[in-house]
């Protein structure tokens, strides 16, 4: 900022010299003009200073799932590229219970949710192939599909009647990792079951810098101030989720509105709540997905701000739909899979939609209206800039970085597409050891980071050629997407929260 101020000072001096040399007749009013010019320049300097503070505050804040703009890219040059359980670990704090929600950060404090269980709980299971192999084994035994589902439920699903939970919000000091306070916001049976890979607190909280907003789908919304005082709570109706897989769509904030999307087997809706009171402002029912098929969704809504307007983009079973801030539909697009988990996001003027496993990846330009679905033989149209068939992923949300969009499958296949054209630049398995991923990849300092469920982070050079640089080990299951705050990387594993910071 000091350099900018010096430049402004030079500009002021230069203006005085011009006035003296070329406009001698203005000497009589020179002092007045000089004062006005200096005042305007001082005002500009102040504005630039405030802007720099805003940028700085963004660097030390991570207000929601996947960060300020929902595309997790760090900007600090000192962010660590290597770590282990001991190397470049500033601190590691145990978090009781289990939760795959991401940590959020504001005002030098970290906020994270968790749920502890009275009695035994089914442990998480790494990967997805164990279910596929089990189903294949049961099919060989000649079991009917109903019997197979019954066996799967018995093995993999934790039902509400089996557990009593204590849901809690934790506040930790960013610098030390010390727990400053914890608040239990609900005790009792959950509204639905969960798959053993999921948790009962997979929705990440969100903050506006003044309050922390906690959401558990089909259970409720809660608001806390930064000191841990509950400001309001709003109970929500319980609705069934497909096969009791559990929930995971995080809330979004825009202005005074706290927005949630809830696609379940009974009803599907988008709703906005007054963030100051918790009262519902509007609710829009969504009738998406094929009749008689699965109706549940897990994708977090995305607030897309662009030059034409601000809109709320949602992805659900079979369709992506965008709404204005009053809940009115703006446009929709078919072609999504029946199981939708990745979150939409924007990069360099375009919206990117991952349609889910087996579906396409889409790039959409601003200003869309009506049904913008692609025709049978189309790969683009007036609003869809490009699409890539079968480029959609199951669990991780893609990341856009340095001109590329990177997609990561749950089995460890990484692909890079040109962000503007959609051209595939490479597609490869990261490593023979990289076989299970839920966490979304992130990027900084010319590198891409992919955290596996086994706790290994594969560090890859960004660019058009794939190059695995090294592997960082934490040796504990991980499914939560990290937070990037200044020069710190916050990584949540099954039992701990790590602050990774370069010590060199």
Over which residues does each language-model region extend?
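Bacterial N-terminal signal peptides
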Residues: 42-54
């Amino acid at each position: 900022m000091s350099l900018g101020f010096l430049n402004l000072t030079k500009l002021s001096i230069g203006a005085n010299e011009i006035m003296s040399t070329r406009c001698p007749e203005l000497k009589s009013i020179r002092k007045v003009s000089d004062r006005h010019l200096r005042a305007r320049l001082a005002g500009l300097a102040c504005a630039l200073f405030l802007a720099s503070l805003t940028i700085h505050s963004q660097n030390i804040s991570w207000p929601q799932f996947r960060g300020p703009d929902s595309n997790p890219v760090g900007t600090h040059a000192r962010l660590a590229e290597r770590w282990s359980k001991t190397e470049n670990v500033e601190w590691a704090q145990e978090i009781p219970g289990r939760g795959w929600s991401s940590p959020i950060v504001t005002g030098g404090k970290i906020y994270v949710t968790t749920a502890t269980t009275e009695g035994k709980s089914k442990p998480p299971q790494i990967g997805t192939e164990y279910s596929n192999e089990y189903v294949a084994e049961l099919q060989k035994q000649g079991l009917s599909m109903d019997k197979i589902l019954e066996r799967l439920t018995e093995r993999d699903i934790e039902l509400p009647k089996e557990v009593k939970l204590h849901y809690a919000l934790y506040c930790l000091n960013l610098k030390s990792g010390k727990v400053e306070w914890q608040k239990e916001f609900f005790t009792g049976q959950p509204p639905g079951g969960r798959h053993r890979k999921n948790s009962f607190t997979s929705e990440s909280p969100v903050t506006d810098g003044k309050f922390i907003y906690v959401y558990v789908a089909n259970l409720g919304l809660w608001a806390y101030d930064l000191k841990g005082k509950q400001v309001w709570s709003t109970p929500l109706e319980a609705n069934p989720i497909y096969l009791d897989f559990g929930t995971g769509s995080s809330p979004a904030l825009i202005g005074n509105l706290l927005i949630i999307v809830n696609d379940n087997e009974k009803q599907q809706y988008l709703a906005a709540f007054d963030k100051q009171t918790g009262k519902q402002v509007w609710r829009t029912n969504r009738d998406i997905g094929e009749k008689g098929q699965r109706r549940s969704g897990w994708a977090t809504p995305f607030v897309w701000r662009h030059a034409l307007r601000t809109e709320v983009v949602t992805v659900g079973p079979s369709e992506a739909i965008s709404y204005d801030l009053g809940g009115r539909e703006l446009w929709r697009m078919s072609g999504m899979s029946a199981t939708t988990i990745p979150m939409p996001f924007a990069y360099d003027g375009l919206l990117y939609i991952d349609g889910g496993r087996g579906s396409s990846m889409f790039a959409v330009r601003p200003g869309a209206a009506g049904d913008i679905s692609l025709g049978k033989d189309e790969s683009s149209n007036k609003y869809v800039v490009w699409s890539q068939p079968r480029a959609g992923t199951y669990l991780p949300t893609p990341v856009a970085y340095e001109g590329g969009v990177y997609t990561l499958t749950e089995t460890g296949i990484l692909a890079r597409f040109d962000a503007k054209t959609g051209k595939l630049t490479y597609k490869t398995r990261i490593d023979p050891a990289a076989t299970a991923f839920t966490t979304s990849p992130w990027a900084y300092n010319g590198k891409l980071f992919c955290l596996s469920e086994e706790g290994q982070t594969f560090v890859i050079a960004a660019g058009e050629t794939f190059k695995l640089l090294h592997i960082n080990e934490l040796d504990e299951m991980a499914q939560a997407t990290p937070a990037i705050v200044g020069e710190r990387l916050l990584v949540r594993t099954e039992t701990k929260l790590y602050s990774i910071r370069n010590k060199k």
